[in-house]
Amino acid sequence: MIQFCTMKFYDRKYELDKLKEIYDLSAEFSHMVVITGRRRIGKTELIVKFAQKKDDIVYFFVSKKKPIVLLQEYRDILSLKIPFLKNTAFITFEDFFNFLFSYMKENRLIIIFDEFQNFESVEPSVFSVLQNYWDSKKNDIKGAFIFIGSVFSSMQRIFAGENEPLAGRTTAKLYIEPLKPSALVEMLEDYNVKTPSNLLFYYSLFGGVPKYYFLLDRYKLFPKSKAEVIKKLFCERNAPLQNEGREIFIEEFGKNYGVYFSILQSIASGNTQMVRIADYCGININSIGKYLEELTSLYKIIERKLPVTEYKVEAKIGRYRIIDNAVSFWFRYIYKNQSLIEIGEEKILLDKIYADLNTFMGFKFEELIKSILIEKNSDVGNNPLPFQFTKIGGFWTKKENIEIDIVAYNEEEKKIIFGECKLNGNGFNSIDVKKFKEKASFVEWERNIRAEYFALFSLVDVKEEIKRKLEKEKIKVYSLRNLL
């Protein structure tokens, strides 16, 4: 039985259902499963939940130790289920896998390797050994091999790289995404801190990454002030997240980490276009594309966004954003101000953060609203919008400098909704209404036949009087509280 000290387990129904399906099938057929996702996303906790009340699951962690030490540890773990192994020694991984595949001919086992990519430095021959046994014996055994990894580029190379021993052999892959907004709302309810302001604050700092909420729980920070949360987790000397970016990425990036860190700091600081990123970093515009492509496709740390109605993938109007909110926060505020922490000037750093926090949270509010709308879109009875959309995103133009926070549309029904996001929608006046509708006219999509809708999304509740005025202008008002 795998046991870890955990807080309440949230969400992950899809992933658990998928693992249960594989578990049931493994009674007759063997499976090879790969689970990836960024560090802290909850991959191990998912396996812990999946393993509950199952006595045929064996969990191995791939520590960076000498192979013989790992083999001794693995023998000891296996002997808890197979007692006669106590007096057996595995000298090589060939011995180890030979035993597993022989035993699994008659006995189902679910073998889990966590941080599987570490074998690249511990014992690279494992991949070829495993390939040989899998190719020759997979039809003779019952059970599954589940490989978990946090270094996405390494896991991608091991299981999809050209000429790699294990390439093309998986029967299932799971990429673990952040928790959905509804799970965060449930969490805040459990800790009696459910307010729109708190949801936006925690989402802005941590997104849907479970480990950060675990830290809030362990440090009893849920009921504390925003300043106390930031100070305790980021700004104090030896704070648990003071070196978060380094801990997550230096192994992934290797010796070129300085270039990647500069690019991530640039994007986090608001430079989202290729030219501005290159200027900020002092990198030639002809060279920056390589690094941006690697951060996008190989490492999956950033993404390139286009206006939602743009179909040309190579359009020069693309913008880059850091996918993970905690990473974005760290590179925006902590990375470039590490010296303030080291000399004990945490108050200066906190003041800097607080002076800019509303701007940062304003960007994240747009992302939160989009996430909520996406989650509710398939729930016909609970969809707040007047139709179910097939595409959602933002819209902007370069020439006219037009920007609309949210545009969603249904390609078959020819319906489109334009949304503005405000931390305080009470200041949205008649001039704003006029500008809003003028901006919508720049969206060319199905201009002559589309049905148009308009929405204002506000963090705070909008006064009834203002709401009535806006709805007379055909602008539906949604407060975050009403969307939860």
Where are the model-predicted features located?
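Phosphate-binding site recognition
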Residues: 1-351
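A cross-kingdom feature that marks ATP-driven nucleic-acid transaction machinery
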Residues: 318-484
